[in-house]
Amino acid sequence: MRGQVGDLSPQQQEALARFRETLQDLLPTLPKADDYFLLRWLRARNFDLKKSEDMLRKHVEFRNQQNLDQILTWQAPEVIQLYDSGGLSGYDYEGCPVWFDIIGTMDPKGLFMSASKQDMIRKRIKVCEMLLHECELQSQKLGRKIERMVMVFDMEGLSLRHLWKPAVEVYQQFFAILEANYPETVKNLIIIRAPKLFPVAFNLVKSFMGEETQKKIVILGGNWKQELVKFVSPDQLPVEFGGTMTDPDGNPKCLTKINYGGEVPKRYYLSNQERPQYEHSVVVGRGSSHQVENEILFPGCVLRWQFASDGGDIGFGVFLKTRMGERQKAGEMVEVLPSQRYNAHMVPEDGSLNCLKAGVYVLRFDNTYSLLHTKKVGYTAEVLLPDKACEEKLQGLGSVSPP
């Protein structure tokens, strides 16, 4: 038995009745109180009544905190409306809404320089609520229950800039919210045009997805257009994605339905952005340098960093050691990212490097040019690992988009 309306075992039917009885105080506050809604929470916790009740009560708290009953009327800041990608394409063969998330054309740093993290996350919560509202409209239209959504993630153009920590944290928090507050609502998460960097990106958000959600991930290979129409009818897909749908003016991307993002104009940038919090702090003496070693065990990992300085600008470069177990001078190592001076005392810096070789990579903060001033540097450095299963899946699919 699948634990759905019309397909319940006697034990599941009894659990549903007991669940409803336990929630008498909560039922009037729920967006829905029918069997379909309650069974979603029971299935999410394998019909464990206590765990299901705890999950639903926490969701009600979340609804109140986020004022979800009014969120569909909430207007995101203009910069998010114009430059945060995504859109409802249409419906799959069963009538479930299909949402496209366009990753590669997004300008994560521009968005975060122009809007708050809270508004970025709230926009994604609004999308979830909007898609559930679409499910209700589809249920009324089709005369049968529609309660799941399809999400398509277009990864073409995914690059190191999309692995910027604040941007990744938005998707980590989004998937955590999806798991905790929208159980059993995702039908499929479809990945198209995934580049070689995708396993690293996936590994950053995977732990925020439940096991059942991970099972719903479908990665399409080089023939993704032919495969995508097995999930969604061509007349519900833009020509850009292998369908037949266009805008009234013939645009194959259907810009009236899907926002493709783009570079955020600097006029939207806010001047009062908070400085990031760093994990480490070091004083780099006048005429000296400081090295931070990071061991890369195998190719394909990404080295990511953030830093800011006090007391003036600071030199920064990335090097690969040629001898282990001893400190090497810059001239004795392989220069991977050329050293240059950054005005990190004015604007915090961040970056990342796709490590093509294994070895010890050195982040070098250089103050050798300053004979008068010491510099205080706050920094965070971390190694991002690819998800090996995902990497093998991409390799098995053969033709994928270039990195």
Swiss-Prot record:
Residues 275-383 form the GOLD domain. PROSITE patterns: CRAL_TRIO, GOLD. It comes from the Eukaryota. Residues 76-249 form the CRAL-TRIO domain. InterPro entries: CRAL-TRIO_dom (IPR001251), CRAL-TRIO_dom_sf (IPR036865), CRAL/TRIO_N_dom (IPR011074), CRAL/TRIO_N_dom_sf (IPR036273), GOLD_dom (IPR009038), GOLD_dom_sf (IPR036598), SEC14/CRAL-TRIO_domain (IPR051064). Probable hydrophobic ligand-binding protein; may play a role in the transport of hydrophobic ligands like tocopherol, squalene and phospholipids. This is SEC14-like protein 4.
